[in-house]
Amino acid sequence: MNFELTEEQTLIRDAARQFARAEIQPVAAQCDRDAHFPLELMAKARDVGLVNVTVPEAYGGSGLGVFELALVTQELAWACAGINGTLSLNSVVADVFHVAGSAQQKASVFKRLAEGQFGAYALTEPAAGSDVSAIKTRAVRRGDTYVLNGGKMWISNATLAEF
């Protein structure tokens, strides 16, 4: 069994490493001090294929897998875990729709992510933390719609998200 990175994976890792050192590391400490996310970094990272890593190419994403996302995340987080969290979250949002979205939902969400919109991720609950087996929020079908009942906290990308 070969555990070496493929040539494509090496290029992806190296691009993420170079971006992290050139673009993220120089601003990371100031962003932490100011509790500020540099939106211009999102556009730059998207332009070089480091955002929306798991969004299919047909919708404007990189069309890569979770292993390649892990390579990108590792390099970006080296420079700043906070900035990486925001940059990589769109792939987490995309993965939810890969697994459970209808074709119509996938088309809508993937397109919006690829256009530069931010998605949010609501997992943590007051009584459950991030233990998915203890989550109480439920979606109940009522006719043609779903009614959500429950409470969430610490929503990832909540201040930036457009959906």
Model regions and ranges:
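Glycine-rich flavin
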Residues: 25-163
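Alpha-helical bundle segments that constitute or directly flank the non-heme di-iron/ferroxidase center
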Residues: 15
